[in-house]
């Protein structure tokens, strides 16, 4: 399965993106800070793409 990391500090935006990516068939890991994202990348080396700070 394709895995995506979402890094967004605004919870409502992050939730919207996560819900829609999951509906599209992606496995999603999410972080609210850069530190969280780095830890998630270490724990999930199979992340294929990261989406950062969506506007």
Predicted region positions:
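Non-catalytic signal-transmission and effector/linker regions of two-component phosphorelay proteins
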Residues: 1-5
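Conserved acidic carboxylate
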Residues: 8
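Conserved Rossmann-like nucleotide-cofactor binding loop
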Residues: 12
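Charged docking surfaces used in two-component/phosphorelay signaling
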Residues: 15-23
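Short phosphate-binding/catalytic loops that engage adenosine nucleotides
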Residues: 26
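Acidic, metal-coordinating helix/loop segments flanking the phosphotransfer/catalytic sites
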Residues: 30-49
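The short loop immediately C-terminal to the conserved phospho-acceptor aspartate in CheY-like receiver
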Residues: 54-55
């Amino acid at each position: 399965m394709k895995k995506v990391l979402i890094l967004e500090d605004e919870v409502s935006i992050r939730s919207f993106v996560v819900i829609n990516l999951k509906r599209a068939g992606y496995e999603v890991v999410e972080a609210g800070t850069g530190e969280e994202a780095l830890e998630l990348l270490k724990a999930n080396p199979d992340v294929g793409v990261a989406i950062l700070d969506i506007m």
